[in-house]
């Protein structure tokens, strides 16, 4: 299975690429929704073909190119949210939650994220769910190996604290130790809103760019709790998503009201289900990710972090991992403060700006800076967006620009 979904009433749904099994489980919940599910998958195939195969690695730097796409995007119901699109095909609330959850994987609210992101549903159907053996860090190691093979010099351990410009022409970067490196082109994988605010001269930013920048909506924050256990929980899937009692209300609290509540939903990652090298023999390892408000909330995470940790341990102990607390041997957690202070994301958001229609493609921060000659962006805040496939695709976009 790809994901196991768990509901408060104990219902479990094993989400996979086996369509026969999928339809059987859907029928057990709501027989009338099987046909709607099939139609939904077929519709998301059309979105995938346009939004991913055709546009995910294409630069959106010119308004005319964006305008050319509008008729096709409207035909694909891009004006609807993912939840609204799913709801037009299936009626049972549990199925609506399961089939509309994908925007959360890229920092979006299913109730406001454009239905174009419904393409993730079909992307998984086409190519499956993949895991980097040894952890996601091995993707970075692989890229480093490739760079070394191409004789690209890598300088580690120095934070960039200034991008140097002469007027609106990029001249290089300054490191935290004071060293300067001259360059005509700077490719930046940091969060664009933070870069424009902190590393560049704000006087260079024009009225229209500032107007757009200051009105952007940011993705949720993340509470991420890593823990190892002296017990193996062999029946727990690699990916588990547990829904709280309320769905929309919980998302409203996170994205709009910017407040915490106890009725949490969470995602539990157990890599040892696939890769037993991730924990010693007889042990298990996990992280649990809880969507929380970003730092626009002004939440004191030094106080709230410990409360959420204990809350989520209690929930997991009840839902999936019996006697968890007594079996934890190593643990630590990260809050939006880590994302803001260590990773320099604006407001500690986990995925940069939200993937709403008005913040997608041309309306995101451009891969080729709108302000500076010689400044380019890759990563979650630029086109096409967050998530490993999106971030890696942003490099493909840049390859077509440079």
PLM segments and residue spans:
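Active-site-adjacent "gating/activation" loops or surface patches in catalytic cores
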Residues: 98-126, 130, 369-373
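A conserved FAD-binding loop/helix module that cradles the flavin
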Residues: 380-402
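N-terminal FAD cofactor-binding segment of flavoenzymes
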Residues: 1-2
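Mid-domain catalytic core of redox enzymes
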Residues: 161-280
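Rossmann-like flavin
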Residues: 8-112
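A glycine-rich dinucleotide-binding beta-alpha-beta segment and adjacent secondary-structure elements
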Residues: 92-106, 263-269, 322-384
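Helical element adjacent to the flavin cofactor pocket in flavoenzyme catalytic cores
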Residues: 119-177, 184
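C-terminal segments that line or cap access tunnels to active or ligand-binding sites in enzymes
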Residues: 230-340
